[in-house]
């Protein structure tokens, strides 16, 4: 079942076209990997999916459907709750770990302290972080390591009860142990959420993604099951990129 359907999507920043006639679908409860060199349109696609591109000099054409409904007919706050975005550099809010976790739920609803505590605990456990911070909830979030901060961002997103979690280079600059923890978290959550993972690390896409899309210069060059893309690609450019001949 398709969670997201994209049809003939074009995105412009001024006179520069960032996405060119993109059509693809995202299955519910899959990890979709998106690979490609810098400036290939990967991050622009994520920003289009929750309308972060909406700035004065950007314009878009085409259709993006979430559960069969045009995202432009969904209130922006609801859309961004349902389709969360985690950036390459962890964005922690000023204040404690607990305040970072509780900010979103408190902003969107009136909630009792006990219910809020339960949301925070569940989300931190789901993000594989609870055991490391359960005795530090009143510490500043800035005291966490880079990998912990990234998992805090995942937990903060989970606290909003999303349906799709988009991750833009979430392991950029992290050590192998931190990377493995984030990948393990994705696998553990996959039965309940849909993931879109942008990565410049082709090995990470090969390890984690059910299907992989290869972008180049704003175009979708190849899109198929990950094993097929990495072992028998249809386009020579895909093979060249995967084998490190460019990028």
Question: Model-predicted segments: where are they?
Answer:
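Catalytic Walker B motif of ABC-type/P-loop ATPase nucleotide-binding domains
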Residues: 165-168
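Conserved ABC ATPase "signature" region
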Residues: 114-134
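Conserved catalytic motifs of ABC-family nucleotide-binding domains
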Residues: 161
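Helical segment within the ABC ATPase nucleotide-binding domain
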Residues: 179-191
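Conserved ABC ATPase signature
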Residues: 139-144, 148
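ABC ATPase "signature
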Residues: 223-224
């Amino acid at each position: 079942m398709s969670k997201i359907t994209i049809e003939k999507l074009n995105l412009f920043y001024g006179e520069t076209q960032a996405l060119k006639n993109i059509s693809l679908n995202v299955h519910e409860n899959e990890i979709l990997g998106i690979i490609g060199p810098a400036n290939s349109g990967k991050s622009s696609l994520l920003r289009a999916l929750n309308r972060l591109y909406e700035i004065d000099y950007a314009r878009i054409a085409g259709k993006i459907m979430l559960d069969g409904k045009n995202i432009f007919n969904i209130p922006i706050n609801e859309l961004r709750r349902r389709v969360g975005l985690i950036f390459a550099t962890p964005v922690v809010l000023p204040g404690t770990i607990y305040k970072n976790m509780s900010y979103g739920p408190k902003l969107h609803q009136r909630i009792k302290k006990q219910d809020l505590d339960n949301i925070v605990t569940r989300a931190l456990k789901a993000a594989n972080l609870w055991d490391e911070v359960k005795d530090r909830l009143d510490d500043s979030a800035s005291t966490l390591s880079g990998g912990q901060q990234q998992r805090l961002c995942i937990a903060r997103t989970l606290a909003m009860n999303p349906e799709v979690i988009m991750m833009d280079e979430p392991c950029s600059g992290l050590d192998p142990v931190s990377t493995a923890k984030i990948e393990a978290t994705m696998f553990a959550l996959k039965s309940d959420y849909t993931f879109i993972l942008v990565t410049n690390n082709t090995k990470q896409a090969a390890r984690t993604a059910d299907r992989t899309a290869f972008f180049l210069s704003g175009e979708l060059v190849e899109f198929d099951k990950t094993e097929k893309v990495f072992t028998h690609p249809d386009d020579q450019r895909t093979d060249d990129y995967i084998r490190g001949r460019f990028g």
